[in-house]
């Protein structure tokens, strides 16, 4: 049965300009749907452990306080698609590890993502997974964290390692190892190149000093917020590199 017999047909112009207009329309419709869905997601009321490695404690404090982001600073559809793509990559890499014989677990017995909660629930973290066994001649269990990167950043991971290429990730790993009690064995950190699908692997031993430093940082943020005190800005000018791309730039520098 032809589809044309199943629906009421209407006549539309078939010019090149008309189709160009439709192409823009569908782009706008999909982008709006993605952004609208994101607005429905419940905002965090706690400090995400993955963010504690950020160099600006004041930004983390703003997020914890539920400060609305500045006008036109919300994530756009393109950025939200990048985030979603990251989740899909994580799912794929997990599957490849299992195919290779690794006993990778990403959920507890209740089907919930592995994670931890400290400071009476004011700080929480959710890990990508735990490798309990596998074909490598090494000790288990070990934390598994998965990221993705473009070509330029991927090369940086390869040449400099996680601690230098992305200190936020390094802090995240140390904190997760500490509070998930996975300190005996290194974390397996994987990064997939979004341009070539090449995968970078790095074993990251537990950094006790870094974990303590980040834990202390969380305490400072919590105590300052409880006392209704704003932590210092990271810079002397709003034109500082980190401030230029901060979602709270206007709020921070106008106060």
Model-found features: residue ranges?
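Short amphipathic alpha-helical segments and their helix-coil junctions
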Residues: 31-39, 151-159, 219-230
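Conserved helix-adjacent loop modules within structured domains
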Residues: 147, 151-170
């Amino acid at each position: 049965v032809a589809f044309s017999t199943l629906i009421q047909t209407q006549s539309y112009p078939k010019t090149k300009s008309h189709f160009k207009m439709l192409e823009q329309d569908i782009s706008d419709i999909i982008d709006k749907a993605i952004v609208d869905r994101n607005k429905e997601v419940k905002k965090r009321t706690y400090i995400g452990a993955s963010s504690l490695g950020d160099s600006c404690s004041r930004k983390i404090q703003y997020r914890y306080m539920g400060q609305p982001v500045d006008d036109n600073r919300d994530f756009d559809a393109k950025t939200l698609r990048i985030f979603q793509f990251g989740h899909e990559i994580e799912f794929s890499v997990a599957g490849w590890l299992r195919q290779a014989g690794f006993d990778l677990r990403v959920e507890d017995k209740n089907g919930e993502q592995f994670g931890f909660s400290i400071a009476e629930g004011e700080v929480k973290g959710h890990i990508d997974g735990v490798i309990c066994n596998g074909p490598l001649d090494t000790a288990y269990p070990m934390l598994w964290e998965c990221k993705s990167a473009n070509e330029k950043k991927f090369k940086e991971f390869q040449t400099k390692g996680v601690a230098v290429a992305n200190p936020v990730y390094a802090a995240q790993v140390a904190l997760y190892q500490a509070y998930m009690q996975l300190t005996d064995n290194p974390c397996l950190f994987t990064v997939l190149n979004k341009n070539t699908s090449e995968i970078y692997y790095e074993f990251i031993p537990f950094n006790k000093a870094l974990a303590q430093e980040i834990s202390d940082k969380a305490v400072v943020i919590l105590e300052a917020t409880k006392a209704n005190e704003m932590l210092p800005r990271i810079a002397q000018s709003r034109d500082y590199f980190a401030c230029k791309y901060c979602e709270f730039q206007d709020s921070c520098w106008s106060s």
